[in-house]
A protein has these predicted regions:
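Short, charged/polar N-terminal "headpieces" of proteins
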Residues: 2-41
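Active-site- and interface-proximal helix/loop "cap" or "latch" segments in soluble metabolic
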Residues: 26-93
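Generic ordered-secondary-structure signal
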Residues: 23-25, 63, 76, 104, ...
């Protein structure tokens, strides 16, 4: 009888946030132990969520730097919703709801971009 042994692999993600005196993020840098990138990556915003199974709630850390522009924030949320639909599909095998999420994200970004044009007079 052959018994297959698995070795565990530890992976880590490090996030460094530089805050101003008012505790507003000036810069966000991150790196991951399994990443091919040699240097820490710069980011202007981050949304990190953990599932608390006891309370059945999401614990979140949402941060963005002072130089994150409103148009970038809209694009960031569009990308998050769009890519979360892929994650949802893989995790639940519910392609129909994942497609609804994608459809919502596409409508969201169209409305956001239209609002930006109206607000900025472009």
């Amino acid at each position: 009888m052959y018994i297959k042994h698995f070795t565990m692999h530890k992976s880590s993600i490090n996030i460094d946030i530089l805050l101003d005196p008012d505790k507003v993020p000036e810069s966000i840098h991150w790196n991951a132990s399994d990443s091919s990138a040699e240097m820490a990556q710069k980011a202007k915003a981050m949304c990190l969520a953990f599932w608390d199974p006891a309370d059945k709630t999401a614990m979140r850390i949402d941060l963005w730097t002072k130089d994150m522009m409103v148009d970038e924030m809209g694009e960031f949320f569009y990308q998050m919703i769009f890519t979360m639909s892929d994650t949802f599909a893989r995790a639940t095998k519910n392609a129909a709801l994942a497609a609804e999420m994608k459809s919502f994200s596409e409508g969201f970004i169209k409305k956001f971009r239209a609002a930006q044009i109206t607000e900025n007079g472009v």
